[in-house]
């Protein structure tokens, strides 16, 4: 007891007496000032600046004069080391953090009980925790001010705001009251909230958010569902994706052609035998025979069409040939008179310049089947006197013989 009193006296001598009394009465003044802060809507709505100034006034000598007597009573009943003074003053966040958004003020809340090392300060620690909770609600965890202080639960005030921000504080609080997992929304990155890299609570929240994202992706929000894959497989089976073509060897093709020449249709036992001997499946043999039959039918049909066209051409050619022969026979029948007239014209021109002997030879050659009378009659004008018959007596050409 003596050591503690001497330690307290030495600590009090380091500062002025009125300030020492005010610092000892700081916890009670802090509790009363922070408890009255949320009731005033003007302070709560103004953000963290007004509350920090009011809290700083509670540590100033001006507010310590009104509460000097309760401070002496508290000092006499529960002595505490001067470390508690710095702890209570450390409950309030720094103005730099408040200007950035007030995210670090709540982070200091859970860390403050670790500063209390004396076992006799349990009541002061409880009061400090309540003051920190009230201060976190009054200061607000984001620029919402009074909305954030009125709507957020006590857990968010004690453990600090997670990395993921809320679009609407009231809706987030309502969702958080219904289900704890719904209080975490998808991340909306904001630079106004300084996140401590070594904060285990925020790292846990990030891990939980990653787990939620993985579950949502596997549920079908990002990855395609299994029915999509099954529908693609069904569409491929319907004919969009063709199977690879079977490559038969020359020996297999020869044997298949031989079997096809023997029989165009294979029975089931024969098909099994051929497939086993050629190391093929029955389906491959069946499909090959189907394709070969279609090819054979096409070639057969093409041959039949070619034969029909040839017959048609022969029929049209035969009719044209018959007509030509008839025309030739008519020309042959009508031809000799025409040729005779032409020949007679030529003969009349030739007789004027040719000898009578040659004319007789030509006439005999031209009419081989005529008798001599006809020949002489035809050439009577051009015949000689020796060949002509003697004139009758008393005729026009009779001349008396000289005596």
Curated annotation (Swiss-Prot):
Keyword Transcription regulation listed? The answer is: yes
Q: Which residues carry this modification: N-acetylmethionine?
A: 1
Q: Which UniProt keywords apply?
A: Acetylation, Developmental protein, DNA-binding, Homeobox, Nucleus, Phosphoprotein, Transcription, Transcription regulation
Pro residues bias located where? Answer: 390-403
Q: Where in the cell is it found?
A: Nucleus
> Spans of biased composition, class Acidic residues?
355-365
Compositional bias (Gly residues) spans?
41-52
Q: Which of the residues bear the PTM Phosphoserine?
A: 78, 80
Residue spans with biased composition (Basic and acidic residues)? 302-314, 343-354
The answer to whether the entry has keyword Acetylation is: yes
Question: Mainly resides where?
Answer: nucleus
- Select a single GO molecular function from the record's annotations and give it: DNA-binding transcription repressor activity, RNA polymerase II-specific
Q: Name one process (GO BP) from the record.
A: cell morphogenesis involved in neuron differentiation
Q: Which Pfam families did the record assign?
A: Homeodomain
Compositionally biased tracts (Low complexity): 53-64
What are the GO cellular component annotations? chromatin; cytosol; nucleolus; nucleoplasm; nucleus
DNA-binding region ranges: 241-300
Q: Which Gene3D superfamilies match?
A: Homeodomain-like
Record's SMART domains?
HOX
Region annotation (Disordered) ranges: 32-81, 299-403
Q: What function does this protein fulfil?
A: Transcription factor. Recognizes and binds to the regulatory elements of target genes, such as visual system homeobox CHX10, negatively modulating transcription. Plays a role in establishing motor neuron identity, in concert with LIM domain transcription factor LMO4. Involved in negatively modulating transcription of interneuron genes in motor neurons, acting, at least in part, by blocking regulatory sequence interactions of the ISL1-LHX3 complex. Involved in pancreas development and function; may play a role in pancreatic cell fate specification.
**What is the protein name given in its UniProt record?**
Motor neuron and pancreas homeobox 1
Species for this entry: Rattus norvegicus (Rat)
The organism's lineage?
Eukaryota, Metazoa, Chordata, Craniata, Vertebrata
Question: Coding gene?
Answer: Mnx1
